[in-house]
UniProtKB/Swiss-Prot annotation:
Gene behind the chain: nkiras2
Keywords of the record: Cytoplasm, GTP-binding, Nucleotide-binding
Family that this chain belongs to: Belongs to the small GTPase superfamily. Ras family. KappaB-Ras subfamily.
Compartmental location: Cytoplasm
Organism: Xenopus laevis (African clawed frog)
GO cellular component, as recorded: cytoplasm
InterPro entries: KBRS, P-loop_NTPase, Small_GTP-bd, Small_GTPase
Sequence motif Effector region, location on chain: 35-43
Record remark: domains: In contrast to other members of the Ras family, the members of the KappaB-Ras subfamily do not contain the conserved Gly and Gln residues in positions 13 and 65, which are replaced by His and Leu residues, respectively, and are therefore similar to the constitutively active forms of oncogenic forms of Ras. This suggests that members of this family are clearly different from other small GTPases proteins.
Name the record gives this protein: NF-kappa-B inhibitor-interacting Ras-like protein 2
Length: 163
């Protein structure tokens, strides 16, 4: 087993951070199940890198941010990457992701961290409130990867940056 990485998952309250994690790691998220508010959890997964090395990843599933709440300071210490999650049916959740990106840029303790943005619930086309092209342009300007995925459990997020 190679090194261990710390990845912080963050975003506005109710955008599906825990659901995405549970589906990607365990394949067991049930759409429509009752939402339980996360305080903070740590998930540990083993990931094979593009170099064929297995690395342990500690995913820090943070409490959903509501108005006035900032990311806890310990989320910036020793973090290798961030996954910023918004819901495509909630424009405020995308604004929160933009603010989180600025907060990370100001507070990170390393010069190089990986940031990935996930737009959840992309299958809810009739309820979309975040313009896909505008979100992609923002991500391109910020030099970060942005992917959209559906609410249902068969999501293939395609997180490799070369895709």
């Amino acid at each position: 087993m190679g090194k261990s990485c710390k990845v912080v998952i963050c975003g506005q309250h109710g955008v599906g951070k825990t659901s995405i994690l549970e589906q990607l790691l365990y394949g067991n998220h049930v759409v429509g199940s009752d939402m339980i508010e996360t305080q903070e959890d740590i998930y540990i997964g083993s990931v094979e890198t593009d170099r064929g090395v297995r690395e342990q990843v500690r995913f820090y599933d943070t409490r959903g941010l509501k108005d006035g709440l900032e990311l806890p300071k310990h989320c910036f210490c020793g973090t290798d990457g961030y996954v910023l999650v918004y819901s495509v049916d909630n424009k405020d959740s995308f604004k929160r992701v933009e603010a989180l990106k600025k907060e990370i840029d100001r507070s990170k303790d390393k010069k190089e961290v990986t940031i990935v943005v996930l737009g959840n619930k992309s299958d809810m086309k009739d309820q979309r409130r975040v313009d896909h092209e505008a979100a992609q342009q923002w991500a391109k300007a910020e030099k970060i990867l942005l992917r959209n995925g559906p609410t249902h459990g068969s999501a293939n997020w395609n997180l490799h940056p070369d895709h």
